[in-house]
């Protein structure tokens, strides 16, 4: 796992936990929010393990039921298929959980937290300008009507490009990865499209500064 990718994820989680008017938050307040985000991830790992265990148990129960309750081959096949689906879901969930210990360990590193704080500070300091820039790039959408998670992913990306000087393509790729993990099924395509339409506005603003 890349430390900066984890820092972005922490910043995203932290943004969702900020109050409605975060302008007066101190650096110490932001640090506390980042710590809370790390704890949230640890809690997610525990929840995912418990859910996977329940799915495996349900899958096992369906297999047993297929042997005892099925009245014909078709109903037995349906029960077995459901059991396999539950098992596959549990395995996929466990695969995600296996990454979390490394994630949490890296998230506790100072350089990761520092970069998260840099992102948060830039987003909060320039939030009005960032939101206005994104609004101009949207087609048939209002920025404040987007899902909160998508708004925050876009804000992080613009803040990185404009104020932290992260290469544009790297930033877009990282924003897409965040959207794949946290947005809905088509969220990553939407985020990618908005950011690509935002590039001319970003370049114009960069030349004007």
UniProtKB/Swiss-Prot annotation:
Keywords: RNA-binding, Transcription, Transcription antitermination, Transcription regulation
A biological process term (GO) from this entry: DNA-templated transcription termination
SUPFAM superfamilies found in the cross-reference section: NusB-like (SSF48013)
Pfam families according to UniProt: NusB (PF01029)
One GO location term (cellular component): cytosol
Database matches in InterPro entries: NusB-like_sf (IPR035926), NusB_fam (IPR011605), NusB_RsmB_TIM44 (IPR006027)
Disulfide feature: none
Top-level division of the source organism's lineage: Bacteria
Statement: the UniProt record of this protein carries the keyword Transcription regulation: yes
Signal peptide: none
Gene Ontology MF annotations: RNA binding
Similarity comment: Belongs to the NusB family.
Known role: Involved in transcription antitermination. Required for transcription of ribosomal RNA (rRNA) genes. Binds specifically to the boxA antiterminator sequence of the ribosomal RNA (rrn) operons.
Name this protein carries in UniProt: Transcription antitermination protein NusB
Gene coding for it: nusB
